[in-house]
Swiss-Prot record:
Organism: Trypanosoma brucei brucei
Complex formation: Component of the RNA polymerase III (Pol III) complex consisting of 17 subunits.
Subcellular location: Nucleus
Protein name: DNA-directed RNA polymerase III subunit RPC1
Transmembrane helix as UniProt keyword: no
One of the GO BP terms on file: DNA-templated transcription
UniProt-annotated binding residues for Zn(2+) 1: 74, 77, 84, 87
Region entry Bridging helix, spans: 846-858
Location of region: Disordered: 992-1016, 1057-1099
Pfam family, one: RNA_pol_Rpb1_3
Alphabetical list of PANTHER family matching this protein: DNA-DIRECTED RNA POLYMERASE SUBUNIT BETA' N-TERMINAL SECTION (PTHR48446:SF1)
CDD domains linked to this entry: RNAP_III_Rpc1_C, RNAP_III_RPC1_N
Amino acid sequence: MLKGSSSTSFLLPQQFVEPLPHAPVEISALHYGLLSRNDVHRLSVLPCRRVVGDVKEYGVNDARLGVCDRLSICETCGLNSIECVGHPGHIDLEAPVFHLGFFTTVLRICRTICKRCSHVLLDDTEIDYYKRRLSSSSLEPLQRTMLIKTIQTDAYKTRVCLKCGGLNGVVRRVRPMRLVHEKYHVEPRRGEGPRENPGGFFDAELRTACAYNKVVGECREFVHDFLDPVRVRQLFLAVPPGEVILLGLAPGVSPTDLLMTTLLVPPVPVRPRGCAGTTTVRDDDLTAQYNDILVSTDTMQDGSLDATRYTETWEMLQMRAARLLDSSLPGFPPNVRTSDLKSYAQRLKSKHGRFRCNLSGKRVDYSGRSVISPDPNLDVDELAVPLHVARVLTYPQRVFKANHELMRRLVRNGPHVHPGATTVYLAQEGSKKSLKNERDRHRLAARLAVGDIVERHVMNGDLVLFNRQPSLHRVSMMAHRARVLPFRTFRFNECCCAPYNADFDGDEMNVHFVQTEKARAEALQLMSTARNIISAKNGEPIIACTQDFLAAAYLVTSRDVFFDRGEFSQMVSHWLGPVTQFRLPIPAILKPVELWTGKQLFELIVRPSPEVDVLLSFEAPTKFYTRKGKHDCAEEGYVAFLDSCFISGRLDKKLLGGGAKDGLFARLHTIAGGGYTARVMSRIAQFTSRYLTNYGFSLGLGDVAPTPELNKQKAAVLARSVEVCDGLIKSAKTGRMIPLPGLTVKQSLEARLNTELSKVRDECGTAAVQTLSIHNNTPLIMVQSGSKGSALNIAQMMACVGQQTVSGKRILDAFQDRSLPHFHRFEEAPAARGFVANSFYSGLSPTEFFFHTMAGREGLVDTAVKTAETGYIYRRLMKAMENLSVRYDGTVRNTKGDVIQLRFGEDGLDPQLMEGNSGTPLNLEQEWLSVRAAYARWVVGLLAGSKTASDGNAIRDNENYFNEFISMLPTEGPSFVEACLNGDQEALKVCEEQESREDALHNSNGKTNDRESRPRTGRLRRAVLISHLVKVCSRKFKDDIQDFFVKKVREQQRIRNLLNLPNTSRERTEGGGDNSGPIANKRTKKRAPSLKVKDSKEGGRVSELRDLEMLQTELLPLTRGMVTRFIAQCASKYLRKACEPGTPCGAIAAQSVGEPSTQMTLRTFHFAGVASMSITQGVPRLVEVINANRNIATPVVTAPVLLMEGEENHCEIFRKRARFVKAQIERVLLREVVSEIVEVCSDTEFYLRVHLNMSVITKLHLPINAITVRQRILAAAGHTMSPLRMLNEDCIEVFSLDTLAVYPHFQDARWVHFSLRRILGLLPDVVVGGIGGINRAMISSNGTEVLAEGAELRAVMNLWGVDSTRVVCNHVAVVERVLGIEAARRVIVDEIQNILKAYSLSIDVRHVYLLADLMTQRGVVLGITRYGIQKMNFNVLTMASFERTTDHLYNAAATQRVDRDLSVSDSIIVGKPVPLGTTSFDLLLDGSISNDILPPQRCVKRGMGPNFHTAKRHHLVPLAAEGVFRLDLF
């Protein structure tokens, strides 16, 4: 039973909601309980009994229980089927039966209480103690469950009741629904021996039976007490009320409610009758089962039944009552189950049950679905809605004065003419009118008044939600602006394909038309495409240019691409909007003809006119950057923008595509916002698609035809490779091949052949690419621009397809020791094991084609298998993390208020706003370029503001100008930065004084109103910003800034050394420097006459040293003004990157981890640096980590070699020590180091002589000799379960360091031979070296680490030569047991990141931190499984909507669970807004000032006003508190 406490809430789907006297209620808590017999009778409208024929009165289809057809009327309330929800009835059972859902609870209670007096089987002290614990208000449901289990365990151990002395045995479940009490089966384990019990019912019967048959008394322990429902009910009635709480029930609840004595019959509308054919009508399954129960009850009421038939009928009633609850009947024999019946359990659980199909996921109105197609002419945030869909979907538009005439025109158009309307709601009449009749339209249009509501069509500019399933992350549903166009498909810009994971091969998508102004506002501000350009997963652009857009941009921005005035103007017109202002830039070439470059075209796209305040400055390398110079790179691989001027480079996918944090859109989004970035993206899409159409871009066979030179190179490479492979195969067959570490000869051969054959394809591919021209070869253009394909595809098309692999191995000999019948047995040649020497151009041979299909099939199978697994991973993560959100105090909590993190991601920053590639808040290098450009503009503006040249020279010669605008010395810079970051008051004072001087100097030239002037009124000054930075920024961020300036100072020192400038203040004061540097000499020779200091009337000119200082400042301006501007800008941006309160960080983190899992495979990968060690990766490894498995497939311990001081660069010492560590770690069996074991038999003694192979031991650097072997054998014999436990110290004797003897435990000649044979069979498998749990250890390629296969972390850490502070293990459970919960959390984070890194997938580490903190929040590692989620103390409906639906509901009802803080799943199920995002605060109207803005009645009516503030739910915050919002009406 669900009992709901309610509070008033306005949830009606209108734009403006007025307070109603009978407003709908909002469920604020859920109370689960048991319906007693009296409760059922109170809810029921009539008792049901068996009826025969067509009689319905008092049957389960009685009309008083409701009706399900439109023509009938309910006899209870008099309403029809639409308005009447029905009324329940009841069935009184003739005899009680066990409740299937509470049967386990009944069993536990029977074990807890005395079967004679019904007291709990504990003493009074324990009862009082547990009562106090259970009565505590702070006891969580999970803790309460564990405490009840402890009570039951203690009571179960009691044999004799401490109250009545009754004997209590074991209560067992026999058959599906029967209990027996094995009273005499077990001897007493707690309490006194049995006392006489003359009053016991079962004892009296036993004494009577023993009097008639003495054998019964002798077999007393096999006599069982049958506990039928009547007997159990009697025991439950006798339970003292004060001890009910110890049984797990709430005070005042009777345990008898766990038994079924009365059944509640649901209303008829719940179980409507259906058609079984064309004419036949059949009852619902529930109705049929209730009728069966009535038949059994009616039969039992017949007094003529004997005991046997009565018992059989009773059991049938029990079975039918159980089948009513669950037709699968767990525990029942198969012939009794009726799985085709849909009982209560079947209607609730599984994917198609009520919880997941109807409550958690609901069907919606105002939606449409159609096929999608591309349209690059649409803006990025636009969606082409078919005209047919636009006429069907409507919006309730309220009529007001501004749109009165428009609404009248729409009403006159009607439902069939677009734009039109379908219905009108007349507010004065309170009725809705249809517009199908043309005569009514004109009449209603004339009567249309302000306040009426018109259901109008979708119109251009309306916000619609667009969604593609499966919706794996937030941006699978975004808001677009509708544009109504003809035809039948939804069309949108291809830039939006990535977030939807959509292609245009027949995909269908859904559109939803939002119905309220609140929904429109939320969709615009939270879900619009422009606001989701950056992914919340890792801060990378997810909406970006793709395919043809990239190829065209690559071509246009290439070197030597020019357009004349007509062509350039035509190109501009392709993207120019109707209201876009633009100004053509100055041509790049003026004579003999004006020509503009493609780069200038992109400059104009980014900044159409100087009036646009978007000054983009950044630098970034492209994919093919050669690192041989930046702006003069031969491949144009370095892109640079300065103040929105395209300086150098060629745009490709790394600059324009998704996932590029250093790209154009990421930087543009940072400085101009998402709206402007979307406009620029739309311009690029519209221009490039048109340009490529005119340019002509096609792919044919001629583009991939190999040249004769390429064929010659390919033949030479193949011949050389075949020769090398033949040599390897021959050396393996002759036994001359040295196996790789940890591998057999065959495995080593496979590894070497794979390596060699991979080189063939790579070399052929390199040669193929070199034969192509970037100017006219379309495949190469696509590869270079990143629009499609890779160099590997070109290699396979032109040169060689290469080696085909299945599960990372060559094609196996699966057909009679060969891969195909075409080859010889055991053939290892490349062609026989899957190597494809042909290209797609030349065509594949039959065997090559077969091998190629085998490799392709693996991908298909892998995709099909992983889909279900990754979907389940995603669902579990979402269910576990959906309740987590950022609160107003900065903590991350669930809906119950439990703290998961003190700061989200440890620093409280939003991952979506992170600009650095490693998750850092800012890209400091790009910020430096931006600040440097702005600073240069300001200085240039300052100098240019002088009226005459003499004024400019005066400014330059001014000492203050020199001190303020010349770079600090390398010795001054770091200390000044550190002082600013540490909040040093002297440094801040210097900043303030410097700003004052800059203002004075700037204002003196009349530049106070310039856009680049000093900060305007209301903006924080730099000193204030820097002081605020010290308080709120993380220590790591400040360290990053300081490290950045350290690099800049080193760069400054290199420049000053080239110029031979002083590096200290003393040298500068003394005029140091002999002007002998290479650059200084050139400048001196060139400008010597003009650099000498002269005395003149104008005050003289600057000295040569000062001129060089200015040159160094131009190259790297490390001035105080530049540094303080940079720190202030970083500070202000850092403050804006905080994660906003209410952010559903849990759901975003779950999506960020779950969505990339769909791109993984199910394979294993080689460990980094060790090719011979394969570890589990991909989806299987992710499952192991998030499930917190106790046993994983490939545990690995990484042991770094201990470094001594001064040994950092000695590789040979590294390797020697690594070999020594490996010898200590790797398990060594006696058979591996023994040369022989000889059985010695003489007249006096019998023993085994063991000879060690010291040459092998020395070669492998093993610390093993006869003494250590003796110790290991004795240690193995010391275990209780060891087969060598008969050996002791006297049985082993050491003869020498390489010889020892093992004697049998006894020297009896009759048995000694068998004893020696037994020891001889066991002795070779004794571990004599290394760690027993580690089968193999490998040294990494760099020799600094030893990797051990196993989970013996503690043993590895205790070894000499191992740096125990850096030992790492990938087994979470082992790390938790050895190092604690914090170390386990760190391993979870590292393992998930490594899993994603193996597939080149990246997510922000803050999401992984949140997942790890959730798994470890209770001090133990809890897996994201059905059992782990249950231990995380989730609400009942949350767990029921996940798995084991009925079990959770039964347990909640039995324990009287109360859920007061509704979670996300709970809120969705009960129809309440989820407590996240915009629902995490209240908007409250300040009534004291609302009268000045709007009339009082309008303010109340609209529910909004001019001034609002936030408040936590049910807690008001004064207006003066922090977090005040202002909502401006317009």
